């Protein structure tokens, strides 16, 4: 015959987590929020996937970006920061309704994390696109940066835009540009000016200098051949991450109507490639024509 055992217990009501939180708040008690990730730089990369960019050109851009992040000098620039880490997110843009975030925030602090980032970028499928809304690229980039402030805190915030033509869809370029710059975000540009490509705008670097780039230390790196995209991205990243304004001044080689024309002094890439030229952002002949492509009904870019 089994004996029954009576166990004396005390009664403790079980409260749900939300109810516990409400009661703690009622009595002035709070639970500590998770600590935000501290980084030197929040960098958003915006890639044009409008109909003027064919699949091979986009592949060269994706591959070039991945290769640039794997470059030892880029990794070194990241590690030489005060915190030794940056955060990177990416998205594809064309017309505003077609824009798509392709990679959420990745923290880069060494070669292994750079390799993981590069693999993700290489494997990113193409987003279908139509026109070119650079204004919406700035707006989405700013949204990505600001919406992550509780989780990732950076001393500098940068949007980097790469495309092959002026704004021709979405909101006015000047309005989007000024709003983003007022938020303390720097915008740099990587315009593609390949005269063998479908979309070719010969003065796109000047357009970018006047209408797209902005904020302290902002600059434009022009790409004249898709095969040189990796070298241009590499130079841009080194300058962007280190933000060495002394290096920029010492590297000055000439001046154009758009402002100082600079060459970066960094280690040469393995394959011979023209040294990318860097144009500092500033007013020029395009300053009054930032929306030359129209608002959804101009150009073919």
Model-derived regions: residue spans:
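VWA/integrin I-like adhesion module and closely mimicked acidic/polar interface patches used
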Residues: 78, 165-210
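Sec/Tat signal peptide C-region and signal peptidase I cleavage site
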Residues: 31-35
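Second-shell loop/turn segments in exported
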Residues: 46-56, 88, 104, 120-131, ...
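Von Willebrand factor
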Residues: 37-104, 113-156, 159-162, 189-204, 232
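Bacterial N-terminal signal peptides
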Residues: 16-28
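Short beta-strand-loop
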Residues: 81-120, 199-210
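Von Willebrand factor A/integrin I-like adhesion domains
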Residues: 192-248
